[in-house]
Amino acid sequence: MSGNNGWHETFDLVVLGAGAGGMTAALVAAIEGQRTLLIEKSDRIGGTTARSSGTVWIPDNRHQHRLGSSVDPQAARAYLDALVDGRADRSLREAFIDVGPRMIDYLEAHTDVRFQAYAHSPDYRQDLVGATDGGRALEPLAFDGRTLGPDFDRVGWPLRELMLFGGMMVTRGEAARLLRSARSLDGFLLGARLVSRYIVDRLRYKRGTRLVLGNALAASLYKNLRDRDVSIWLNARTSRLVNENGRVRGLLVDIGGSERRVAATRGVVLAGGGFPASAELRERFLPRPVAEYTAAFEGCIGDTFSLAQDVGAALGPPGEDNAFWFPSSVARRADGTTAIYPHIALDRSKPGLIAVNSAGRRFVDEASSYHEFTRAMYRSHREVPSIPAILVCDRRFVWKYGLGMIRPLTPTLGSFVDRGYLYMADTLDDLASKVGVDAVGLAQSVAAMNEYARTGVDDEFGKGSNSYDRCNGDARQKPNACLGPIEKPPYCAVKVYPTPLGTSLGLRTDANSQVLDASNRPIAGLYACGNDMHSIMGGEYPGPGVQIGIALTFGYIAARHAAQAEIAQRRSDREVRSELS
């Protein structure tokens, strides 16, 4: 042990959690000249980000300007005000709107992290003032995992069911082009290029090295941390924050079988990803019936909350459901593990599918955002059992669009039926019996949808009536991109369950990312970002990638605030010395 007040190691800033928010905080701190340590309790970096789409929602970003789309910060403010409606501190939203674009500029100026506009990405609540049809969402550019050398294996894997051939990643846009490969030279050439690269990769690696989506963002941040020689401790678990005289001064870390006392002279940033993977905290804070499954990273168990509460931190006020949601289908893999497939947009929005409850009745616009869809499951469940909800279509739909884990153009479906994942029947009555819904209600719901498909208007829930719905539909389908008949047996169904992709209940923070105590006073030296901080949107979900956008922004804010606090302290020290002399 060193003689420096009993500390084994001394850093300026220590960050707990190697997701997008934590890595951004560590990277910005390093750029600002801070001695930085990033601690991750698992053996992989990336957290839930590595499994996500990697989309980053930042209103008024530089790429939105380049698109030529309408850019008005006041429109974003109006949209978020209408959506959140007093459920969260407005000052944090203001910080997000003001700083988010500067954060993107900063990363692209000082690092190799690169984004591009996700042009066709409407905001999720098109019914609210200020919503846009695109430009606020960014996606990371593809990343070459080979540049990480042996550390490529340190990057967390995407969900297996979202990769092709067991290890090849593609974006949504690429997937759409590949489905046209039989009739499109562009799609054929893309497929040939991607598959050729993947075959070569598999001669040396466990999976493809062309990374896209959240895996690309995580790997790019990791590469930039390595390039700046940031200290990264994997398999390291923090047992306690050291609070001296009302300030967090350091922490105790268990690593390699020993305990290390680590000083953090400027502060500690908590970026543990919330608690979606904690069965105990889900039971305590999430609505009934409590979600049994999650596709979030297994390390997101809320242990950073306990660390913070031990030094006086307070949680934010509980919200409607305290989570951000996916509706997911579940199946047992051949190796005995559980596969969880988030139904984000590839099937629910397409023409020829409905979602029903146990009465066989529709309860939602199936093309609504994953968050709103799952909330509708809970609302419906108060009156009629609606968890799980049943997605119903016919065999033609599955062939054309896929259904959950079943990809388009899958020739035979028997294996999915045998695993208990897919339900099939030659009549709607038989299908209703197999999935446990009312047969009369299901028949009436299908008949109503078939009529809506003919007229192009969903009189019940308005499926396909807004730009977000239509963006995820099928433009070839007329008169409504999201409405199609269900009329050719065999009929098919899968069950979907509420699964938290993240949690919205977190530590109270201010606009500087500082963690607050029960009296709303900042705890000196303690910051939080990402889903460790209480939702600045009051649990609402404005658009694609908002969680990562907030995580990056407040990770940036935390690191900059800590660095500027050091500068301010040095200035204060000089002034004191000058006065004393």
Give short role names for the model-derived ranges:
Residues 1-13, 31, 215, 219, ...:
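Extreme N-terminal leader/targeting segments of oxidoreductases
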Residues 208-215, 227, 255-334, 548, ...:
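Glycine-rich loop(s) and the adjacent beta-strand/alpha-helix scaffold that form part
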Residues 383-490, 561, 565, 580-581:
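Helix-rich C-terminal "cap"/substrate-channel and partner-interaction subdomain
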Residues 307-314, 443, 550-570:
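Internal hydrophobic alpha-helix adjacent to the cofactor/substrate pocket in enzyme cavities
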Residues 13-38:
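N-terminal Rossmann-like FAD-binding beta1-loop-alpha1 element of flavoenzymes
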Residues 126, 134, 141-189, 305-307, ...:
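An anion/pyrophosphate-binding glycine-rich loop and adjacent beta-alpha core
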Residues 240, 247, 441-536, 540:
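A glycine-rich dinucleotide-binding beta-alpha-beta segment and adjacent secondary-structure elements
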Residues 41-231, 352-355, 362, 396-399, ...:
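Conserved N-terminal/central alpha/beta ligand/cofactor-binding core
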